[in-house]
Swiss-Prot record:
Localization in the cell: Plastid, Chloroplast thylakoid membrane
Origin organism lineage: Eukaryota, Viridiplantae, Streptophyta, Embryophyta, Tracheophyta
Cellular component aspect of the GO annotation: chloroplast thylakoid membrane; photosystem I
Identification of the protein by name: Photosystem I reaction center subunit IX
Annotated TM spans: 7-27
Originating species: Dioscorea elephantipes
Length: 44
């Protein structure tokens, strides 16, 4: 039972940190390279 409580208290923290860092990374990429979705389609 102790392992389950540790798991349930660790996973939300790790997923929050993961999604927070992923959102920050995507925001910084969009800040440095705006409209990056258009680059592969209009590269000619």
């Amino acid at each position: 039972m102790r392992n389950i409580k540790t798991y349930l208290s660790t996973v939300p923290v790790l997923t929050t940190l993961w999604f927070g860092s992923l959102a920050g990374l995507l925001i910084e990429i969009n800040r440095l390279f705006p409209d990056a979705l258009l680059f592969p389609f209009f590269s000619f």
